[in-house]
Structure formats: C-alpha cells, structure tokens
Amino acid sequence: MAELVRPKKPKHRERPQSDDAPRIPDRPVMVNGMRLPVAPSHSIQHQRDRSASPEPEEQVLSDTGESINPEKENGSIQDVRSSPVRPAPPPPRAISQEREAPPIPARNLVFPRSTSMVAESTREPTPVVLPKRSVAVAPYPTVPELAELPSYTAALKHPQVYPAVDGGQLHHSRSAAAIPEKTRFSAPVAQERVREGEAPPMYPSINTYERNEHGLMTEENLVTFYHNPLYEHAEIFVDQFIKAEVVPNQSGSLFPLLARLKSVCDLMTVSEVKGKENTEELQKCLRECWVQQTMSVEAKGKCGDNNDGTGRASYFSYELQQSVLDQMKRLLSTNRTNLLDHTLCEETSFRSLALQIQWQIIIINNNFMAENGLTTNCPPSLVATGPMTPGRTAIRTALSDIFYHLRYPRLSKRFIDTLFGWIKELTCILNMRQSCDDGIFLLCHLLRLPSPIDHWAPPFVQTFIQSQSPPRLKLDYCVALLTHLLNPIKARESFLRHVAQSEKEESTWEILADDDDGEANEFSFVTINESDLTAFLDQIPISELYSIAYLAFTSYSDKGSQFTAMIAFQLLLMKILDNGLTSYSQPGYKMFCKQIGISLKHSVRELCSNWRLIRDQIRPGEEQNLQKEVDRIVLLALNYLIHRDSVGLFQFVVALPYGVVSEECRSRCEYALRSNKKMSIHEIYETPICEVRARISSQSIAKRVSSLGAQDSEFLINSLASIGSYSNGDVGQLLKELIDVCFCEPATRDDFYKCGGEAIGQILTKRPETLHQLLAIVDRNLQHMDSYAINVLSSSRLFECRLTEPMISIIGKWLINNPPEHGANRLARRVLSGLHWGLGPDGQNLWIDVDVHAIAADTVVKAHSVHCSRSNSMISKSISKISKLASKVGDAESLFQQFCWDLLVKLKLPTIPVDLVQNDLTAHYVRIVQNYEDDVVVYLEKAVPLLSDLVSSGSSVASVVLLSRLIAQHYQKVNLMAADKNFMATFERLLHIDQLPYAVQWLSGPSSTPTPIVRLICSAISYYSAKLPPRDYLRAWITLLCQARTGWNEDAVTYQIVGTIARIAFINDTQKLYEITSIVFQAYQQQMAAEKNQSKGILALFSSDSSASPLIPDSMLAVSPFASYIMLRVEQKSFNPFYGHFYETLGKKDKYNLDHAAKKAASKCSMALPVERLAVFRWAKLVIVCKDSALLPIILQQLAGQAYRLRKANNLNLCYARRLIDEPQMQGVMAECRKAIEETTVATKGLSKAVVGWLFTKHEVTRTGFDFSVFDLDYLLQLILAGDKNMWMDFVNMPHFTSEEFAERKLYSVTCQLSPKNRESPSPPELGSPRARGTAKPFPVLPVHSGLPKAPCLDPSTIFQQHVVLQMAAPFMSTVKNLAKQYTECGDRMDIYDDAYCKLIRILYQSTQQTVPVEIRCSYCSKPKPCTMTVKPNVLSPEIDVKMSQNRQKRIEFWNELNASMIDQAAVATASMEHLSRLVSMMAAALDPRNRNSVQPTGHSLFYLITSSVGENELLFSVASESYSHSLRALGEEFVKFRPEEQMDVMQLALNGFVLSEPLVEVFTAEVLNSDDLCTAYRKLSDAVRMPERSKMALQLLGEQ
C-alpha cells in the first residue's frame, strides 16, 4: 500500500481503464539467492525478478498496465543494491479474469495521514534501477517520535573546520538527491487531505497462493512478499570487496602519509625502549663510578703495661673508577642523541604527519558535505545505494587506507588510537548520508581487522532505526549487515597476511586462553575474537529489526498480507542466524552462539507476539493457513537450536512461544525433543501425526537425558514441561515421567530434582487442574522418593489450584501417617499452605468448597493430635508446668504446630454441632469456631476455658483470631464480656502472650515494639472497623482495654492498641473521635476516685505528695502519638476545676509564679497538680517525643492553644502565654521543645516555624493595637485568641494515615486469607523481546578540533602567480631554518651540561682528614691503650651532590622548554611546507595542457627555492631534511619528471653534491632529452664517474646503482 499513500503531484494524471487486469509477470529463476526453510523441501526455487509499481512521476501507463522506467541501465554492483523497497505481489489470474480492474483513486484520498507522516513519505532518495526491472521508491512512513530523539536532532557546535552549507555557497549541489527531502511536496499534500476514501484491495487473499502438501507457502511465493536485493548480492559484494581491498592500490592521498606515520611510530617504539635501557644503564653507572673500599692503618707504641705493642684500625674510603666514568660519558652522549635525534625529531615528525593527514581528512569531509548539501549538524541518515560520486569515493578510499595500516602486527597504542580517531571522524561525516553499500563496506573492513577491536569498533555499525530513512530500506540494510556478520569471513587470512607472517616467524606461542573444556587454545590475532563478533551483533538488536519491519510492511492492504511478509522476513532472518550457528559452532565461540540463540529466540517470540495480537483481524479463510506458517517457524527454530552440540543452545528452547502454535505443532516439537536422532525439518513434517504421538509415548525422557549433558538435560525437561503446560491433551504420562526421572530414579534425581520442581511448577501454573493427577502419581511413587518428595512442588504456585475431597484424603494420609520431618508430611504441608482458602474472584463464594474446608480442619486436628502430643500435654496445666513441658517440644513439632495454626486460621469452617471434645489444642480451636461463636453467653461459658488453654499453651495467632472474631460478632454485648472475670483474665494474658518464651511465634526474629501479636491485634481491629459500624466497634475495644481493666494506663500494649483505635477514629471523625474520649474520661475518673479513697488511710498521713497520678506517664508518651494525644486531651479535661482556680490566682497579681498559683489552686479544690504536670508542659513533652510523627501539626495546635487561649479570671479574659512559657523552672523542657520543632522532618507547610515564632517571642500579643503580621501564619494565632477550636486539618497529611490504615489492615487479611482472589489469573510473560534497555552503542560523535592550525590554502588562480606562492612558502622555510639552528645550539648546550656533570662526578668524593680510634696491645695484653690516628679517606661531598642534582634539574627544565618551543612550531612549519608543495602539484596536475605550461615557472621556482634553503643546520635537523625531501619529491613528480627543460639543471644540481639527492635521482628522466642534450648529459655523467667525489651520484643518475 505504499504507493497509495504518496501525496498527489501537481500535474493531474488519470489512469486509463483496463478491460482485463494485468497479467502476472514472469519472475526470474534466481531471487534473493536464499534458501528459505520450507518443509518438506529446502531446494532453491529459481524465479525471475518481477516489476514493482513505479512512482507516478516516473511511469507511463499503457493498456497493459506495464510501467516503463526511462532511466539508464547500469550493471554495476552499486546499481544492483539500489532498490530499497519490496515489489508488490501480483494478483493471480483466476481472480483478475472474473471482474474488471477497478480504478485506483488519487493517492491523497486513500488512507489520509497526519502531516508528519505525509511529509515523511516524501523522504526518499532517487532510486537506481536494475536492468530489465522497474523499480519505484515506495514512501514508507516513519515514526516521528523516533526521529525526534535528542541523539539525532541535537545540534553539534563545531569550529569552522567544516564550513556551514548556506544558501549562497552550494547552489550547484541542489539536486534531488542532495536536497533534504523533508520539505518536498509537504505543503500541497496538507491542502489536499480533504476526504477519506476506501481503497480497493490491492493484493489478493493469501489463500490463492500455491502451497505444498503440508499447507505451507512455497519459497517462491514467500519471496514475493519480502525480497531483499542486498542479501541477494551479498556474496558478489564480498568478492568484489576482496578483489578491490585485499591489496592496496595506494591511489589515495592518505596512503603515503600513513605509511610514513607508521614508520615513525615504529621508530618511536624502538627509541622508547632504547631510552629506558639507557636510563637504567646511567643509573647503574652512576652507582658504580665511586666504589667503596675498606682501608686499614697500623699504629705502634706502648700499651697500658708499658710494653711495646701495635694496633690496627679499619675505615671506609671511596675510589673513583675511571673506566666507569668514561662509560658514563658515552652513555650521556647516547642519551643526548636519543633525546634530540630520536625523541624530539620523531615526535615532531609524528605531529607533522598527523597534522597533514588531519588536513587531508578535513578536505575529504568538506568535499563530501558540499557534494551532498550537508552541514555538521545534520543527523545520520541512510540512503539507497547509488552511483559512486567523487566525494564518496574519496572518503571510502581514505577509510581503506586507514584500515590497511591497522592490519600490521605490533602496532603502538598511540598509532592505533590516532587512526581510530580518523576513522571516527570520517564515519561521522559518512553517516550523515550513508548508503547501504557504505555500511556494508565498513563492516567488511572491521571484520578483517586484527582482534580485539570490541572496545572501539562497534559504534561504526548502526541500524539507523531512528533516522528518517524509509523503513524498508533500513530493514534490508539491517538484514544485509546480519548476513555479512554471520557468514564465514572470506579472505581474512589474506587481509591479515602481515600479522600471520609475524606470528609464523615466532618460535614459540604463548597460551593466553583456555576454553570451557579445559583445553588450551593457541591465540592468534588472525582468528577473529568472540568478543568482537558479540559486540557487532549487539549493535543489531532483534527488537530494532522488528520495529523497522512493523513499519516496513504496513504498506500491505490487509493484515494477512502484512503478516505473510513478516513470515517471509522471519524465515530469512532465521536462515541467516542459522548460518551464523553453522559458521561458529566451535568451542571458542560458545558465548557468540548463545547470543545468536538469544536473537533467534527473541525473533520468534516477536513474531508470535504479533500473531497473537492480529490473529483475530485476519480474514476467516486465512487464519488457518497463517497458523501453519507460525507452526513452521516455531518448529524450525526448535530444530535449529537442539542440533548444535557443545554450544549451549538448548536453554533457549524453553522460552519458545508454544502457546500460540497448534496442538499438532506442539506434538511435533515434543517428538523432536524426545528423539535421539537428529532429524531435518523435512523428516519431522513427513512423519504422520499419529506416528508422532506413538513415538512420543515410546521415547522416554530417561532414555533421552542419558544421551545429553547434564545442563542440556535440564533444559530438555523444562522444555517438555513448557510444551505440556500449553497442551490440550492429557499430561499424566509426562508428569509420571518427570516424577520417575527427577525424584524416583537414584541415578538421575540428584541432578534433576531442582529442574523437575521447576517443570512441574510450569505445568501447574498454566494447568492448575492437573494437581489431582500429580498428587495421585506422587502417592503411588512416594515410597521411592524418600526425602526428594518435598522438592516436587518447590517451585509451584498453587494459588490457582482447587482442592477436592479425594485430594484431601491423599494429603491427609501423608500428613497423619508420616512424622513431621518426613518428606511426604512436608509435601502435604506445602500443598495445604500454598492453596487459596479465601473467597473466589466474585467475592461471594469460597474458592475451595466449604466441605473441603471442614475436612481439611478435621485432617489437621487428627494430624496435630498424632504429632503434637507434647504440646497437647500443656492443656489445663499450671504456668510453671507449662514452661517445663514447652522446653521439651522439638523443632519439628514446633514447626508442624505452627503450620497447623497458620492453616486453621485460614479455613472457613461451617457451624456443625459437636458434643465430643478432643483433648487437643487444634480441636479446641475448631470446636470454638464451629459451635460457640454464635452466642456470646454460651461462648463465655464454654469457649473461654478452651480459649484459656490456647493462650496458656502459647497458641498466639489462633487466640488473637478467636478474640477478634468474637468482638467483631458481638461488639454490641461487650459489657457481658467485660463483666466476665474469666474472659477478662484470658484477655489480659492474651495481650501479653508474646512475653511467654514458649509461645508459638507467628513471625520469626526477636520481638519488636509493638510485638508481632500486638500488630496482629491492631490489624484485626483495622480490618473489622472497615467491615462493621466503626463507632460502636471501636468503643467496644476501648471499653475492654480501659474501662474493664485496672492499671491499664501503665501498660505499653494498651497504648499501642489504643493508638490504632484513635487513628481510625481520627480519620473518620476528626472532631469527636467517636466519643471514645468519654469512655477514657470515665475510666480515669474511677481511677482518681479509687486513689482518693486510698489516700484517706493512715499511710497517707506520711506522704507529702497529694497530687493525682497522671493519666499517661511521661515514659509512655512515645509509645503511640495518637494514644498520647487522646490521653492528654482527657487529662486536661479531668482537671478543669483546678485550672479555673489556677488561672484565677495568676490573674490576681503579676508577682505570683506558677508554683504559687498551683499551690493556691490545690488548696481550693480537691486535686493538685505540680508545675511540670500543667497541660502546656505536657503537650511540650509530647512534641519532644513525637517530632517526626505525622500528627505533629495537631499536637502543635494543642500546645499553642494551651499557651495562648484566653482564660477568664476575675471577669477578665487574659492570656498567660508569656508567664507559662517563660517559667524559669521549665526552661529546660521548653528549650528541648523548641529544638525538636526546629529539627522536625515532617512537612508542616510552615506551621512548625510559625509555632516557634509564637511561643518564643517577646511580644505581648494582647496589648491594644498589636500588629500580628510580625508572625508567620498569624491568622491561626488570632483564631486561638478568638476561642476557635476547629482542627487545623490543612496541615495534616491525611493520605499518610490512610495508607498506614490500609497497610495495617492487610496483615490480618493475609493471615486469615479474607480477601477475594484476584479475578485475573497471572498473565503469561510477554512474548516479545525485552525493549527496556539495549546494549547497542550510539552513533560516534564528530570530534571538535578547537586548536587545530589552519592548512595553507591556494586559490586556483594563485598558482599562476609565481611570487605569491613563493611568498607563502618563505615563512615556513624561515621558521624551519631558525628551528634547525636552535636545534643545533641546544645540542651543544646539553653537551655542556653533561660535561659539567661528569666533572662533578669526578669530585663527588673528596679527601677529608679524619681520626679513627686504635687500641695498642702487646702479645698478651691485659691493659690495652686507646689512641687515635689521622687518616684521609674520600667521603661524599654534600655540596657537590647538590650541584649535581641542580645540574640534572636544569638539564630537564631545558629539555622541557625545548620540547614546548620547538616541537609544535617545527611540526606546523614542516607540515605546511609539505602540504603547500603537494597542493601546488595537485592543482597543476588537474589543469588542462594549455594552462599547465603557465604554471611550470611557479613549480620550478618553488622547487629550487627549497633546494637553495637546505643548509648545514637543516641537514642536522632530520625533521627539516625529511620535510624538504618529500616536498621536493612532490614538486619533482609534477614539475621536473618527464620535462626535458628541467633535466640538465637537476643533473647538475645532483652532481654538485646536493645532499638531498634521493628525490632528484627519482625525478631525473634522461630519456625525454633530445639527442644532443642526451649526449651532453651522458658525457658529463661519464666524466663524473671518473671523479671519486661524484662517482657514486653519477652512477645513480645513470641507473647503475
């Protein structure tokens, strides 16, 4: 349909009507050069190329509908690859003969598109048409959002090395191919999109195409839907590439420069080695110049006994080694030579050559950009292959030259990095308008470079998926890249002949790598590295290929044809990937083969994912045929993967999309997996389906795994399970085989029990109804499974399974008859624990039948009574005995008991009257649930004793569940519960059940605050408060917790539970809190009354503290912010009479402090409060401990209100904020409060800062005319003063409390499985390949040459002006002359430094007078006499040592200055000189003969100007002499060679002893002289031969040497 969505051309054309539809054109025999894997035959069917639909502006319509292409025929390989589009499949004759062909409506009326897509449809380069084929470039719409990514559209800021292409500079380049097509025809199209039309079917139904006996389309017809000319001519391209590139033609301008650069780098490597050796020798020589020697001196005299004696003393002295010093002089001379003649000159030569090459590359890139109308900001784009233009030829030649020089052995890193930078620069420019052949050309070069190159080469291989090129062109290009990458690399050894020869000459090989089998592999740079191949393959992700394919095939008119094209593309892609597996199925390429396997798997999954989405949109008659094609692809992929030995591809068989294939295909896949014989796809299809199923039954898994490795066997088992999970047939036989092989057979189960569990998990996930079969099979084989039974369901998700009565009987047998540590018992627990015991998806009915719940409970009770006798012995025992019995319960029994309780609380048991009570804890639970929960009176009478036993035994979870259910059902009768002493005693013990060390902990790990059981109680309250009327339900809990208990306000557990209740009340009733404060108030009043009665006793007379106890102690404030908030509100309400007298006393006199007022108030009422118990300070303490609580804004409101609220005293409304807050004895509390508010992490929208300003200000806010604007949020403070008591809910994060509520509610719901099951089953994994994050590297970025010197530029007219050219060259020669002189002087100066250094070495050790101790002894001296002697040893002179260091430092500084001043200047000057000479020669060579002679004087003058500039210093400076030699060579080739008038002068110059005679000899061509001049020249040369000083040169000119 691509032709139907092109915009209408301005010129109106009408398509003539045809009486008959066009006949199907004959196709050539050979198409695409490929063998698509067709079953049952793979033979290549040859066919002719058919015509494609031409563009309107290119076609001439006739009655026969045939299009004629007026373009010239071109048989080159570039033309062959030019077609980026897919030819349209012709309609069959049978259909076209029955009706008249309908007229095709105008393009703009069919399928109108968005403006961006219309504009995109015009972005098509001019096609190059094949001989005898009409090819039209079809407009493929692109996705605008892909083309607008920053990596493609962001402008790059470059210096003016590459000039911008403006309107006034390159008008000559504005051809159809050069102008960006983005603006072409876009405006008219936008105006023509007026109405919508229904396009007639352009392609017939795919049912009309020929199929083989298996219902599969033939290769001939599949090629009709997808034809790739680039793939077809891949072999031809490679052959031509090898022919052209294996031997360099040296025609490029870069080749001689690169050759010189390589030589310089080689010399630099050698010089670097020599320099290091010289440095080491100098250091060694310096150490050996002075040698330490031991000297001795003898003394004679009298000893202490006055006898004649002698004494000897030894000392050290250093002696100069003259021979070593002479060697030092030679080494220093060598060092100077190495630094000057090698390091400096070679570095200068390197930079000079690199600069010349860089200038050449910029010229090449500028020519390419000008030729194609590009700028440096153009994004990458892919174009169809067209004729080779000069600019494209130059850039490819430059790349060839660079790649050639990368194929030498032992290249230096600097050389490689430099060449890589130039490849990057050339490729960046080429990417702006890269043809398909260019990309393949690059890949072919990269594949023939010495490995490894994976660290820099991959970015040069790109898919251009996000460019605005036509999708079909990009698709063909990517397929071609894959083809060249995965095919065997032809002639790699020939390209790397230099490397191979170097390796061959080495006498030994170094083993660098071992393969996975432990065998040593010889490493060779000629053999391509696996990492290189993997890196290139990563650049062509399968997901990107399919993204392009989806766009490329949208031109088909219907989904059937579109998907058929996808099938043809997929078959071709699979063939290419299989070629890669065939080429690299070797141990050294295992990871690469795995990467190919991943690509193959992803491609199949992508196709099947697309098929799953569109199969409902296919025509009714076509769906079955396309399903067969999908079956073929999956079966073919499986066959490719399982027949590659030792490369680890079996793992990818598991993930093939068996769910979208037919049942017959699944059977054939299973048959191929089970078979020990390698079968072709032909053999698999030829086997009848009945025979396939019979062979499946006869070929066991055990026999198959014996012929495979352990890893492949695991993947085989999982693959068979994956097929079985999607199968519609019975999987009983498969399950039996899995149980036998993986869990029963001793020889195999150690290897396969894990994968067996995974395989069974796959089956149960997709077919949960097979659980019954599985349990029956396991039950029959249980005695053979031993401890492996537990692994059967280790990876299974049983939430989707349902349990039936026969199944529970099997499980019950395992559970009761086997001890807890037995595998069968553990397996039974795994099944029962993994099931969903709650409601179904409808939320009304149970997922598992209620009768099964009752049977399961009965089974658990029986099992518990059998296996938990020690736990049951705790029933009706005292606490001390229970503790002793609990210590004897083993770990296995404890775990089993925990399982029983976890399961029982999930079961939904019906009400069944039972009179008999078993002496078992679980039976107690079941009896309570089934008999006593309906009537609270009966519950208190009969169930409470049973509940008490559960609590005493530590059955915490079950006890909490029973208590929660009771209060939820009978919360309206809470007073009956509160009045029952036994119930309240049990309730009290349950609240603290976590404190029992033997309690069955519901959560592992140490108890936290709150404890796990307290959290479960809080969760139950949250859950039921959402199901019941919350007011009465929460008040019932408050009644039990506070009103019915004594000492409750000193219990942390109570505050934790009350905190949950208060939070629920705060969320739903912010102001009144469901009036739970009234219940707490009554409880507190009762407590204070009891305390008051106790204070009337005799002991109260001896107590000085008459104040009432606080409702909540300070130590409990941090337990729960919500509980503390409620308690403080109740507490301040309880002391209202005290506060009335307190504030009245304060208002009488300002001198009264708080302590005095409190005492006065206590004397006037029956209650007393100390200052620290005042409400404002209690709220301040709560702020300190709750600074990070989300309730902080409300607490701050209470604090500010208590401080600033007006109090009525003596008929006046007074504010006591300053007197309260500034109380001296409470300054510590208030300072801590201020710090807590300032450090809070709660977002209070500025309230924290405002409250700090209010509380700690010095202003008296109640004075007349006070300006409240000095405060933040001053309106809130004014509301407090006005008596407003509304909550400041704007500052409270209510969603935080709500989320806490939902999270807390979930705990109890999950524990008891009270939530309905999810309506939707877990969706199968996505079939498509992952697209989240790719490993492909992005396009290379064009480098910026900010400080690059400019190259000499010549205008074409300048070369006719001799003086101008000479003036340009003169500065360069002058610079070289000065630098050469400086170079010579520097050598002399370094010589001076070295001479001075040697002289310093000679005097480094100097003779110094010293005294040494000597003892004079006689023969048997008992009293030696000490004395001293004077000696003169040579010792180190510190002053000389410092001077030597200074000498070396000055030499280093001088050398650094020399480098900085000379290298860059010399490099630029010599490079400019050579570049100018080369430029003059090239421009002269490009002139026609008439103008050429006019330029001869310019070249002649420049040539002899250079010869006259060569002096003594230039000859010593090798950089200058080499530069002059190459400049003379370049000029001589054009202006001297083969020119008679120049030969005599050149000969005479050479004979006169010109030192740089080599280029003169090369350009001396005497054969062009006339006879007289030739005789004269020969006579002069003959005479010169007889002269010793000229003999050698004369012979060279004569060609004798």
From Swiss-Prot:
Keywords: Autophagy, Cytoplasm. One of its GO terms (cellular component) is cytoplasm. It is found in: Cytoplasm. It comes from the Eukaryota. InterPro entries: Autophagy-related_EPG5 (IPR051436). Residues 1-109 are annotated as: Disordered. Its main location: cytoplasm. GO terms for biological process: autophagosome maturation. The keyword Cytoplasm applies. Transmembrane segments: none annotated. Residues 15-26 have a biased composition (Basic and acidic residues). PANTHER family: ECTOPIC P GRANULES PROTEIN 5 HOMOLOG (PTHR31139:SF4). Involved in autophagy. Has a role in the degradation of protein aggregates within autophagosomes. Essential for starvation-induced autotrophy and omegasome development. This is Ectopic P granules protein 5. It comes from Caenorhabditis briggsae.
